[in-house]
Design a protein with these regions (language model features):
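Periplasmic-binding protein-like
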Residues: 178-191
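Short amphipathic alpha-helical segments
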Residues: 10-12, 132-134, 183-185
């Protein structure tokens, strides 16, 4: 199986290796025109849960994982580049009317929309919100996007996801005085599952113009 932290394709270990399938998780991303018919498979993981899928031998490849990769020689990784995050709110949100950069104290008075860490065996991570801040926890970026558009809270989103909504005015980007606005993203894989299929997927991913656009070093 292959896991995307932000975008997913899958080739389950239980499937016929000669007939891998691909799932398009949303309209924001697709490596191929094929569709994965295994919607019951848990192919979407976030934060520590992404690396955990690799270290627990539940995935052969992960794409878009952030934070430090595992140090074991059983696994390899490649840096994809930086994932740019943008702090966004709906036009109806109170923070939309403030012209100056938003400081953490002010942001902390408003509900944060956050994605929960899918890790089961390791300590979960939290990013880009204050510990004392009220928050709504959602499953993935699609649900977070809907919550932000609905004005239920504020939060950071990858720029490549929200760019169309910023251009249309459905969401507004706000400057902040602090918070981690860029994440280093990785492609990781299990060395014990090395084979022709694994190498083919890695080459396909690393040579993808869309991947290079999403994760840049600018």
């Amino acid at each position: 199986m292959a896991i995307f932290s932000h975008f997913i394709f899958c080739s389950a270990k239980s499937q016929n290796p000669r007939n891998p399938s691909i799932r398009r998780p949303s309209r924001h991303f697709s490596l191929d025109s094929s569709q994965c018919r295994n919607d019951h498979l848990p192919t979407h993981h976030t934060l520590s849960g992404s690396w955990e899928q690799l270290t627990q031998n539940d995935a052969d490849i992960i794409l878009g994982a952030i934070n430090e990769p595992p140090t074991s020689t059983e696994f390899s990784y490649r840096m994809l580049g930086m994932l740019e995050n943008v702090f966004v709110v709906s036009p109806a949100h109170p923070l939309a009317k403030i012209d100056e950069s938003l400081d953490p104290t002010l942001i902390g008075t408003h509900r944060a929309i956050v994605i929960g860490d899918t890790a089961k065996f390791s300590t979960g991570q939290t990013t880009n919100y204050l510990q004392e801040q009220e928050r709504m926890v959602v499953y993935d970026f699609n649900h977070k996007l809907l919550a932000l558009i609905s004005g239920l809270g504020c939060g950071f989103m990858p720029r490549h996801i929200v760019e169309p909504y910023l251009k249309s005015g459905v969401l507004i980007a706000k400057q902040t005085t602090s918070s981690r606005q860029k994440d280093l993203a990785y492609l990781g894989w299990c060395n014990t599952s090395e084979g022709i299929a694994s190498r083919w997927w890695r080459e396909k991913i690393l040579n993808s113009e869309l991947i290079q656009h999403m994760y840049s070093y600018d």
